[in-house]
C-alpha cells in the first residue's frame, strides 16, 4: 500500500524590475522564504535586505507562517533583483490567499500592501531606450560643425 501525500497548494507569480525577473512559488508550509535556495537572512547587499523584508513586515509574520515561498531570480543588477524579489513575494502572498484561503483576507492584505507602496504589486513599465545611429546614446547626437 502507498500512503497518499498531502496535497500541495502551489501559486506561481513573478516580479520584474528593468531586466531582472523573479519567479516566486508559494506553497503551504512553515513560513520559510528562500531566494535561489538561500534564506532571506543571507541576502546581499546587506543595506537592501530590509527592502526584501518589507512585504513580511507590512502584512505581518502571522500571514506568512503557513506559507513557504521559493524565489528564483535572474538578470539585471543587484538592486533591480532586490526590487523584483520583493514584488514577487508580495504578489505571491496575495495570489495564494486569493486561491486557497478567502477573498476577504486577500483584500485586506492587498489593501495593506497598496497603502504602503504600490510598486510591490504593480510592475514599473520603464525600460531602457535603445541607442540610435547619429549619436552616442538614445537621444544624444554627435556635435554638428558648420565649418
Curated annotation (Swiss-Prot):
One of its GO terms (biological process) is maturation of SSU-rRNA from tricistronic rRNA transcript (SSU-rRNA, 5.8S rRNA, LSU-rRNA). This is Small ribosomal subunit protein uS9. The keyword Ribonucleoprotein applies. It holds the Pfam family Ribosomal_S9. InterPro entries: Ribosomal_Su5_D2-typ_SF, Ribosomal_uS9, Ribosomal_uS9_CS, Ribsml_uS5_D2-typ_fold_subgr. PANTHER family: RIBOSOMAL PROTEIN S16, RIBOSOMAL PROTEIN S9. One of its GO terms (cellular component) is cytosolic small ribosomal subunit. The gene is rps16. GO terms for molecular function: RNA binding; structural constituent of ribosome. Keywords: Ribonucleoprotein, Ribosomal protein.
